Amino acid sequence: SAEKTDILIKDGKFEKIAPNILAAEGEEVIDCDGTMALPQFIESHVHLDSALTAGDPRWNLSGTLFEGIACWSERKVKLSKNDVKYRAREAIKKQAANGIGHVRTHVDVTDPTLIAMEGLLELKDELRDEVNIQIVAFPQGGILSYPNGMELMENAVKMGADCVGAIPHFEFTREYGVESLNFA
């Protein structure tokens, strides 16, 4: 609404929204006249495991999804837990500075080590008081087209993934695409 109002915050949460709330003695008052209060924003689709890797190992010169996936396949062999956590933390800092408080990240689980999943699960726990992170087990190489893809998806869920995704258009056949959706 365009009407001026007050917001009483207690223990970091909105307790009351009403006009002319009187502050108790000793309570901090912040004059936000002329500003707007908004809830935290939501980043509904990001790949924090590959955040801040543009140009490493090479640039996606065609700009296509398929070349981007090929670049990522070359990059992910160099992953370490610390590398994933560092880059993801830096990306989250930038998101938080712009009002994002809830992040859904897709994590490539077509990696036999599941190192990115492990790193992001740790980071989710470390940042739990600062940002809400939802982790999607995402089979970048395909559930059926990638060796042991189904098993890797199941392992990611056992590790703590919040939900699963799929990439049916990347599977080798239409039938695999349909089956991958049924599996997910």
Regions found by a protein language model. Name each.
Residues 40-44, 103-105, 131-138, 162-166:
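Hydrophobic faces of well-ordered beta-strands that scaffold small-molecule active sites
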Residues 115-127, 145-184:
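Histidine/acidic residue-rich metal-binding segments in metalloenzymes
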Residues 1-38:
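Histidine-rich, glycine-flanked metal-binding segment
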Residues 52-84, 160-163, 184:
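Active-site gating loops and adjacent loop-to-helix segments of metal-dependent hydrolytic enzymes
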